[in-house]
């Protein structure tokens, strides 16, 4: 999937309530079924774990019950992973049966064994037409972070990302030493604990300990990202914290938002009880050719919070409806000329 300036304009106008459909030019790849596969490489098996259903949410808490290792709008989960095993053959996971299957495809062409491909299915119903490409690439960005962590466990890394209107290709390379001290079991625990919190009942934090649910990102803004393919990052991360009195602040930029202002923007969570609001901003001047990878990067950075800030009673909810243009232009004057708010993660602790 490729993202263009027209798509960004559609996304931006949507925040004003103006709806223009993002055009999806993706072409469907044709895979020929070969057979079911019983035993596969452990590394491949762990990669497919990322795409398995980990748990089912409670019906009295959320209408979006399916949970995997990454978030997906309305739990649609439209992404599929294919792994090259050579000679135009690919492994994938049948999400309905839970079995591994082998397919043949002659369209992709020659690629190294172990190359990963993410292919997007169509959203099953007519939702989010104005932001569907945005949501799709953000979701893939979340997946890419998980893949990078899992690769590290197996002494591998993402070398580069290639995008077209059929798939996202992820090229993998071996490394001598893992960067993170993380076992698969611990990674799996983070995945199981990941939640966006209840939707059908009010989230409360009567303790009002707003240090709970806070996450300080380990990834720095100036880190080199293979996901960008050496292009320039046009993304800025902005973290607002609950001051425990009347709203959320970012003291370095002298930004303050009241609970009332934030609750009027997004009323599914009461900001009086939330701890942190991490916003991801995109430069207005970004060249069209860099859009796809920078939006993937935003999803990648958001997943660090969604994954590593996961534990019992913690929630990390991705939010596309960040702040309205009026609030952005009035309260973020130091940033509004250069950036647009593109994505956010709302984090906190909730009482059972």
Map each language-model feature to its residues.
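N-terminal accessory segments that position/regulate proteins before the catalytic core
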Residues: 1-352
């Amino acid at each position: 999937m490729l993202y263009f300036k027209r798509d960004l304009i559609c996304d931006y106008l949507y925040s004003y309530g103006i709806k223009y459909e993002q055009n999806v030019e993706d072409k469907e790849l044709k895979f020929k079924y070969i057979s079911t596969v019983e035993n596969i490489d452990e590394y491949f098996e762990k990669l497919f774990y990322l795409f398995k259903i980990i748990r089912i949410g409670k019906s009295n808490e959320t209408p979006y019950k399916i949970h995997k290792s990454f978030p997906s709008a309305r739990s649609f989960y439209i992404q599929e992973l294919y792994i090259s095993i050579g000679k135009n053959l690919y492994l994938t996971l049948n999400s309905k049966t839970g079995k591994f299957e082998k397919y043949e495809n002659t369209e992709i062409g020659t690629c190294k064994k172990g190359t990963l491909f993410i292919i997007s299915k169509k959203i099953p119903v007519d939702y989010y037409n104005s932001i569907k490409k945005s949501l799709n690439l953000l979701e893939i960005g979340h997946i890419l972070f998980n893949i990078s962590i899992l690769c590290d466990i197996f002494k591998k890394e993402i070398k580069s990302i290639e995008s077209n209107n059929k798939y996202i290709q992820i090229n993998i390379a071996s490394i001598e030493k893992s960067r993170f001290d993380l076992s698969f079991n611990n990674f799996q625990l983070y995945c199981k604990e990941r939640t966006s919190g209840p939707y059908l009942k009010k989230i409360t934090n009567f303790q009002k300990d707003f240090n709970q649910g806070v996450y300080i990102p380990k990834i720095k803004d100036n880190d080199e990202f293979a996901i960008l393919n050496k292009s320039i990052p046009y993304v800025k991360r902005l973290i607002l914290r609950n001051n425990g009195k009347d709203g959320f602040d970012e003291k370095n930029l002298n930004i303050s938002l009241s609970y009332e202002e934030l609750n009027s923007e997004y009323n599914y969570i009461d900001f009086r009880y939330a701890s942190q609001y991490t916003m991801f901003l995109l430069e207005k001047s970004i060249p069209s050719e860099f859009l796809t990878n920078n939006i993937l990067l935003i999803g990648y950075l958001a997943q660090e919070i969604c994954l590593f800030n996961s534990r019992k009673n913690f929630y990390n909810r991705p939010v596309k409806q960040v702040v309205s243009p009026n609030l952005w232009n009035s309260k973020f004057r130091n940033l509004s000329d250069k950036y647009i708010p593109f994505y956010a993660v709302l984090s906190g602790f909730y009482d059972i």
